[in-house]
Amino acid sequence: MGYAKERGKLEKISTKVSALTNYDDKSLAIITDIYEQYSHTVRILKNKNPEAFEGVYLNELPEVKLAKNALKVSEEAERQDNFIKFRDALSASLNSVITLSKEAQ
């Protein structure tokens, strides 16, 4: 079962995530869109191969979502720190899924 299409999407959005450094409205919109693409792709991969991707779906996806929610509810002074935590959690999970998709081939 090939995962090249999904891996290509994840690699593309992974480079976008690493370029985000500061919290502002534009970066927030970009990272929110990236999160939506990431979560959609993880669900597709889990449905294609539950054995390989269920761990990501059950563990890493909720972890990234918690970081996203922490950013959403944080006070103005904490937003930059929570943005960086969200970005790092998303980036780490993206890299994990990319590696898994290569191994699951």
Regions found by a protein language model. Give the residues of each.
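Short, solvent-exposed, charged loop/turn and helix-capping segments
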Residues: 40-60
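Helix-centric, low-specificity signal for extended rod-like, repetitive segments
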Residues: 2-5, 9, 14, 61, ...
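Short, charged, amphipathic alpha-helical segments
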Residues: 8, 28-39, 58-59, 84-88
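Short terminal alpha-helical segments
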Residues: 1-35, 94
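Amphipathic alpha-helical binding modules
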Residues: 65-105
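Long, hydrophobic, amphipathic alpha-helical segments used as structural scaffolds
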Residues: 21-25, 49-56, 94, 98-105
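Charged, low-complexity interaction regions
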Residues: 19-31, 50-53, 73-83
